[in-house]
Amino acid sequence: MITIGDEQLNEIREHGVRDHPYECCGLLLGRFAAEGKVVTETYPISNAREESAKRNRFLITPEELLRGERYARERDLEVVGFYHSHPDCPAVPSQYDLEHAWPTYSYIIVSTTADAAKDLFSWEQEPDRSRFNSEEIKII
């Protein structure tokens, strides 16, 4: 289960609509807790993928990931997951998403159109990396 506030969910949705028709991306910051992950902050990142691929791929560079991890540590937080958008596509992980994900983390995907965010779901990867499972979202 992932626990997240309305404010953070709205930030993800707004980022997705703002970056449409390209995929947006960012980090989910908070804590790993006994009851699951608790998100207290989002950390938006610019999609570093080349222009021709941004419509269906995102890239977080190692430098940006380190910046985000440093930002989290300075606030006594952890990276508990990632988010990205699927412009004009369902909010379900692609095969590419599966191949590039890491177990343990949450992956929030929001489906966007030019003027609105649609479905938003969270996913967790199996430890053997074979597939994603839907993750319950608790909104606070």
Model region roles, listed by residue range:
Residues F82:
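Conserved, mostly hydrophobic/aromatic
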Residues M1-V79, P87-I140:
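Conserved beta-strand-loop surface patch within small alpha/beta domains used
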